[in-house]
């Protein structure tokens, strides 16, 4: 049997081409992992959808349509998914991790940009991009427990130091736009004390933070 070798670059082109065929209905925007990396989710921004992909990434297995485009997703220890959606009246959804059925829907500020479940505080943390705040939310009641003032336009966060701290990327510094000596700043939030304990200023030119 004669072997046919296909360069990796061609495979990549074929994959992109197959995805492009669905571009009329799917606008892939963000990727999320759940179930310890065993489940892959992709957002369809144009359709306000969260889609669970097959293990090979070739087809959609399940999907749910939400109020507006999905900005971020996290998973709690029980397996439920928590999703925040874009918009001035942003929404936070609680989804069944297996069926993707909506368990709850809660208004969540002005453009919630990221969400994270903390095993330290056993609560949800949500960055509010146009409120310039970090909210702590009780997942049982879905009520805001704490509001922390942070930098302008927080867009993303990540845990570190054994989940005891959050590193938050802010799109703009805390000063008028006419006086920017720097561009992006990072805030360090201590989860147990619920306080901003540090700030890292990035040099001018480090603009438009998207992720951390």
Show where each model-derived region lies.
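Positively charged n-region of N-terminal signal peptides that target proteins for export
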Residues: 1-4
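Hydrophobic helical h-region of N-terminal Sec-dependent signal peptides
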Residues: 6-14
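Predominantly soluble domains enriched in secretory-pathway, periplasmic, or organellar proteins
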Residues: 13-212
């Amino acid at each position: 049997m004669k072997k046919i070798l296909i360069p990796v670059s061609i495979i990549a082109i074929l994959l992109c081409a197959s995805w492009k065929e669905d571009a009329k209905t799917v606008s892939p925007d963000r990727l999320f992992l759940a179930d310890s990396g065993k489940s892959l989710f992709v957002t369809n921004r144009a359709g306000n959808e969260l889609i669970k992909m097959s293990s090979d990434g070739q087809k959609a297995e399940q999907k749910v349509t939400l109020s507006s485009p999905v900005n971020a997703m996290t998973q709690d220890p029980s397996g439920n998914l928590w999703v925040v959606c874009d918009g001035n009246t942003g929404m936070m959804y609680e989804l069944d991790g297996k069926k993707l059925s909506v368990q709850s829907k809660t208004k969540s500020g002005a453009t919630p940009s990221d969400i994270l479940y903390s095993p330290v505080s056993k609560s949800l943390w949500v960055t509010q991009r146009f409120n310039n705040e970090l909210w702590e939310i009780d997942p049982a009641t879905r009520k805001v427990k704490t509001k922390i003032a942070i930098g302008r336009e927080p867009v993303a966060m990540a845990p570190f130091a054994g989940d005891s701290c959050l590193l938050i990327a802010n799109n703009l510094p805390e000063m008028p736009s006419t006086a920017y000596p720097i561009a992006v700043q990072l805030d360090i939030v201590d989860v147990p004390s619920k306080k901003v304990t540090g700030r890292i200023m990035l040099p001018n030119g480090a603009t438009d933070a998207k992720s951390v």
